Amino acid sequence: MKEKTIIIVGGGQAAAMAAASLRQQGFTGELHLFSDERHLPYERPPLSKSMLLEDSPQLQQVLPANWWQENNVHLHSGVTIKSLGRDTRELVLTNGESWQWDQLFMATGAAARPLPLLDALGERCFTLRHADDAARLREVLQPERSVVIVGAGTIGLELAASATQRGCKVTVIELAATVMGRNAPPPVQRYLLQRHQQAGVRILLNNAIEHVVDGEKVELTLQSGETLQADVVIYGIGISANDQLAREANLDTANGIVIDEACRTCDPAIFAGGDVAITRLDNGALHRCESWENANNQAQIAAAAMLGLPLPRLPPPWFWSDQYSDNLQFIGDMHGDDWICRGNPETQKAIWFNLQNGVLIGAVTLNQGREIRPIRKWIQSGKTFNAKLLTDEDIALKSL
């Protein structure tokens, strides 16, 4: 019997790791990856950090350059897909080529959620999703330039830190009443706000841009009535899933390709993962996790499901953020207001714990990354703690 052909669409973390997972889990059939980017699949997290700060930054490839040929994976870079035929199981490129598949993994990622008021500035306005975006930003983030960043989420704050370290004068505008309100607990939000303010970043909360005038400098009028002058304007206010191909193929979408917990779409031969995917949970709610680890996890899950193998157990959600000299790692559930702190954030060394009826369900480490491994195990096992002991620095965590 002829072995099946699997096609992967996308050029990021989830796409590359799907290829790796399929080979690791024993798939020996024909495997193709189609990407509209000219680069080999590369790591996205460094784009807002080392790619802007290092003297001679290099893209960090997800897999070594020789891996693709050694593992007989056919790479098609810099190509654009015109359509997906679900009935014919055919992928058609804009250059007229067509390719047959038995199973398909879609990891087309996401674009920056548009902000038309700023998009009208054209090349004077920046977002950050790809390596070419980082290269453009690196050119304009020069010392003493005034930089306005719209959005105080993870990307916005990482960009604020990098721009400040490059000598720019940075102002961040945020519609909400706090920074990183979507994915950090209140005590970490307060720490980050103070950290950026101490570094010289001006953060304007509960505010938004109402009017823009493009001139020698960009003039931004805010809801508060204040007017800012900017040499560089950047925004990061969320994502818009690259799900057009899926929509045109009549797959179930909702600002993303809807998948089940096996990463399967409404078509049993089509799977999806990474930022483009949104999971329908058992209770019917839709949930998206935008992180490096989630892309890896979903790639492994989809590969197992495609091959009819047992699905790997999901670890607690985890992501990290590097801002200035700080490394913050977030694991587990970030919801809730009853957080306790071990250590002193003012010394830039602390761990915040999220206990629910004594059970550890989440944590954030500040420059304490070595503690993530035991914390992950505790969250997975549902370990209970005495809050007093957990915050006592005289007691080693590993002894608890």
UniProtKB/Swiss-Prot annotation:
Show the GO cellular component annotation of the record: cytoplasm
The cofactor(s) it depends on are: FAD
Q: What is its EC number?
A: 1.18.1.3
Q: Sorted alphabetically, which SUPFAM superfamilies does this protein's record hold?
A: FAD/NAD(P)-binding domain (SSF51905), FAD/NAD-linked reductases, dimerisation (C-terminal) domain (SSF55424)
Pathway involvement? Answer: Aromatic compound metabolism; 3-phenylpropanoate degradation
Q: Which GO terms describe its biological process?
A: 3-phenylpropionate catabolic process
Q: Does the keyword NAD apply?
A: yes
Q: Which reaction does it catalyse?
A: 2 reduced [2Fe-2S]-[ferredoxin] + NAD(+) + H(+) = 2 oxidized [2Fe-2S]-[ferredoxin] + NADH
Per the UniProt record, the lineage of the source organism begins with: Bacteria, Pseudomonadati, Pseudomonadota, Gammaproteobacteria, Enterobacterales
Give the enzyme class: oxidoreductase
This protein is called what? 3-phenylpropionate/cinnamic acid dioxygenase ferredoxin--NAD(+) reductase component
Alphabetized UniProt keyword annotations: Aromatic hydrocarbons catabolism, FAD, Flavoprotein, NAD, Oxidoreductase
Name of one Pfam family that matches: Reductase_C
State the protein's purpose.
Answer: Part of the multicomponent 3-phenylpropionate dioxygenase, that converts 3-phenylpropionic acid (PP) and cinnamic acid (CI) into 3-phenylpropionate-dihydrodiol (PP-dihydrodiol) and cinnamic acid-dihydrodiol (CI-dihydrodiol), respectively.
User: What InterPro entries does the record tag this protein with?
Assistant: FAD-oxidoreductase/Apoptosis, FAD/NAD-bd_sf, FAD/NAD-binding_dom, FAD/NAD-linked_Rdtase_dimer_sf, HcaD, Reductase_C, Ring-hydroxylating_dioxygenase
Q: Which NCBIfam families match?
A: 3PPDioc_HcaD, PRK09754.1
Task: Please give the subunit comment from the record.
Answer: This dioxygenase system consists of four proteins: the two subunits of the hydroxylase component (HcaE and HcaF), a ferredoxin (HcaC) and a ferredoxin reductase (HcaD).
